[in-house]
UniProtKB/Swiss-Prot annotation:
GO CC list: cytosol; nucleus
Key words, A-Z: Apoptosis, Hydrolase, Protease, Thiol protease, Zymogen
MF terms in GO: calcium-dependent cysteine-type endopeptidase activity
Regions of compositional bias (Pro residues) in chain numbering: 13-22
Organism of origin: Scheffersomyces stipitis (strain ATCC 58785 / CBS 6054 / NBRC 10063 / NRRL Y-11545)
Keyword match Hydrolase: yes
One of the Pfam families matching this protein, by short name: Peptidase_C14
Function: Involved in cell death (apoptosis).
Protein name: Metacaspase-1
Segments for region (Disordered): 1-95
GO biological process: apoptotic process; protein quality control for misfolded or incompletely synthesized proteins
Amino acid sequence: MFPGSGHNTYGGYPPPQGPPPNNNGYNSGPNNSYRQQGYSRPQGPPPGQYDQQSQYSQQSQPSAPPQGGTGYGDQSQWGRPTGPPPSGSQSFGQNSGYTFQYSNCSGRKKALLVGVNYFGSPNELRGCINDVKNMSSFLVDHWGYQWNDIVILTDDQNDISRVPTKNNIIRAMQWLVKDARPNDSLVFHYSGHGGTTADTDGDEESGYDDVIYPVDFQQAGHIVDDDMHAIMVRPLPPGCRLTALYDSCHSGTALDLPYVYSTKGVVKEPNLLKDAGSDALNAFISYERGNIGGAISSLTGLVKKVARQGSTNQDQVRQAKFSAADVISISGCKDDQTSADAKENGRATGAMSWSFIKVLNELPNQSYLSLLNNMRTILAAKYSQKPQLSCSHPQDMNIQFIM
């Protein structure tokens, strides 16, 4: 889901200047700052384009995703989970002194769910609010979350403090991680437009940071991955779990976690030759089609990647982005891919959100490796996007997925 017409963003907005000041609590009343920024809420969503539901309460729960067999659920080729996460401090690296701690997810549970349909805009989406409804029901019905501990930001709500403006999203992120403790389980789910912007601190091999777009992005700008990491990952103590789910374009490393895993359960390493070949092919195709600008853009990207290969030290980046907390991010696609705003079983939905819920509904006892592979398998029948799984620490991909 990417609204821009070029490779990067809507307009080159600078990233936020660090995380916002501390907030004493999420429910502190409406915040009207976006009105001063010139954002004007639509009068209401267009009728009949999504499953409208004005209140998210226990008495009016979203409908669950459809049940039924898919044929993908045989996880024998990846193996069943070896067991729950190990307890205690985990060390890794020779003489590095780095330790982390898995969460058993037995503590407090909180969730922040953000869905942006961008009503009335040229790049309107149809499935993002449905994704939030499905995810909230899924967390309550299957994972022990309580409605009172779930904050929902969507652009169809009457309470202006619950509209997904940039300021409201950042404040809600701060609420999510406030007073986090070991064995807590936190969930951040975003469904909306995503994109990229030029990397300014040298931590991206590609030269681009991932971003998400609030409903008021044209006035307030986007939210960059460096800042999402600073707000939601850095404050977490060892043994606290954060599960981040990104159903958006260019979201492969949207939380800036240092360990990205392949479908074989091993850490991916940057592949300059593969990236260079892709850029060269794109340049050739653009030239053949008479798109000189596109050819120049692809060649420029290739030159930047080659130049940055010597200046970006992966070990240093991993040290800077490492966290002793238990942070997992599952995204809908690679950094250079788009994520589908789709329709499944007659309902508008994000393809990634739909596959995550469907796979776990039909096969709850899965390893991280089988979850990643099953999501890819179910999407491969219709979509080209490839979900990604990244972690704040070296991850045993064969233990049971929990959240």
